[in-house]
């Protein structure tokens, strides 16, 4: 059960999103789990402005999981060039081929099955589950930690087990279970555009 402060937070965030959030990115509103996954992997350790360019290149060349899975390693690594952290690219290919071989190129629609895929952690699994399948899993990244810590006055270190539990519990309480995709995108955008790190 949400407290009145928690209810107010969720309501105001969704209100801000509806009236003022004009942040545009090519993957916003997309329901294709492949494209959501691709965007999330590209954005790990990469700024959004740079990531957009790579996302467009990848989605134009490899339109679905099977086309990526069938590509030659050398070709994919060449396209990835400049993004660094090549382990991300290696995991991308491994997972694409696993899904091609074991699931006819389809993403699982279950959060826990998504989480089992190589290179996919809790954050990316929640993003895919909520954006593609509208499942009620809160995304929790640096933006979300910062917003919740500031608004709710949480001082528990986020890199501690206690902190992770506290923030995860709160994030899932705040999540609008009827509109998880809308809520998750809203809180990420609010953290990126309004509640910035050095304010």
Q: Locations of the language-model features?
A:
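Catalytic cores of DNA base-excision repair glycosylases
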Residues: 2-7, 12-199
């Amino acid at each position: 059960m949400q407290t009145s402060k928690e209810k107010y937070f969720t309501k105001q965030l969704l209100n801000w999103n509806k009236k003022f959030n004009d942040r545009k990115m090519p993957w916003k509103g997309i329901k294709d789990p492949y494209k959501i996954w691709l965007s999330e992997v590209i954005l790990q350790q990469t700024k959004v402005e740079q990531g957009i360019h790579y996302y467009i290149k990848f989605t134009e060349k490899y339109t679905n999981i099977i086309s990526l899975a069938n590509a030659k390693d050398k070709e994919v690594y060449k396209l990835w060039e400049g993004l660094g952290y090549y382990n991300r690219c290696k995991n991308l290919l491994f997972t694409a081929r696993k899904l091609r071989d074991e699931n006819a190129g389809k993403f699982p629609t279950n959060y826990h099955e998504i989480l089992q895929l190589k290179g996919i952690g809790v954050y990316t699994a929640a993003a895919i589950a909520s954006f593609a399948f509208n499942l009620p899993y809160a995304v929790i990244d640096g933006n979300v930690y910062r917003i919740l810590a500031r608004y709710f006055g949480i001082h528990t270190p986020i890199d501690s087990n206690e902190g992770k539990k506290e923030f995860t519990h709160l994030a899932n309480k705040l999540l609008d279970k009827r509109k998880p995709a809308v809520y998750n995108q809203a809180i990420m955008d609010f953290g990126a555009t309004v509640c910035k790190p050095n304010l």
